[in-house]
């Protein structure tokens, strides 16, 4: 998942929203929010913030500020980044560029991603399958060749029906077998279809079902 450290220490401070499409963002959100670990959300990711989170500083000592900027340029040059692509951490615009643009919330993309986050958070809070975090209560199946994954939660509860988080990472169509599912779709994003024991994808997407 995203956080200030992982994003800020990228050369340009670009978020996942800068490179992933909506399906990719919701897949990442589903695995973060419905996984067995305590999720952490990074400010703005819930509405696909378009602003970066760049590394910025306000050192009062000019020599320290200069050394910080030169150090970052040298660090990323080793990984093939051009100097012009690495913002100066002492430049005030590096800070202002990192502020959230609240207009993103009501944009078409932002609103769609926010709806997805709200549904996923509600599922985590209300469905008993997501309560048990013990190792044995969870299972994962995947196909490396076909690039799909099934995360199953709630395997140990006597009065809990397991929930399956089914993901297709590939751009290609996929049929993912979920033989233990009862077929109740709780959420879906992307071009998907749920049939008896099978989830069909026409591209990347995620389905949550019992």
Role assignments for model-derived ranges:
Residues 36, 189, 196-197:
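A residue-level detector for conformationally permissive "hinge/kink" positions
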């Amino acid at each position: 998942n995203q956080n200030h450290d992982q994003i800020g220490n990228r050369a340009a401070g670009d978020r996942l929203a800068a490179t992933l499409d909506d399906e990719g963002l919701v897949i990442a959100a589903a695995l973060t929010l419905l996984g067995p670990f305590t999720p952490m959300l990074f400010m703005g990711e819930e509405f696909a913030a378009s602003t970066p989170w760049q590394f910025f500083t306000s050192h009062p000592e000019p020599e320290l500020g200069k050394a910080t900027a030169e150090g970052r340029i040298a660090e990323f040059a080793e990984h093939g980044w051009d100097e012009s692509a690495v913002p100066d951490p002492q430049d005030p615009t590096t800070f202002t560029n990192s502020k959230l643009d609240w207009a993103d919330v009501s944009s078409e993309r932002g609103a769609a991603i926010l709806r997805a986050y709200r549904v996923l958070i509600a599922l985590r809070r209300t469905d008993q399958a997501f309560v048990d975090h013990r190792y044995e209560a969870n299972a994962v199946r995947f196909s490396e060749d076909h690039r799909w994954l099934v995360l199953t939660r709630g395997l140990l509860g006597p009065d809990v029906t397991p929930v399956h988080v089914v993901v297709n990472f590939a751009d290609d169509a996929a049929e993912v077998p979920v033989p233990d599912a009862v077929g109740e779709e709780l959420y879906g994003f992307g071009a998907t279809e749920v049939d008896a024991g099978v989830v069909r994808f026409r591209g990347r997407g995620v389905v949550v079902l019992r």
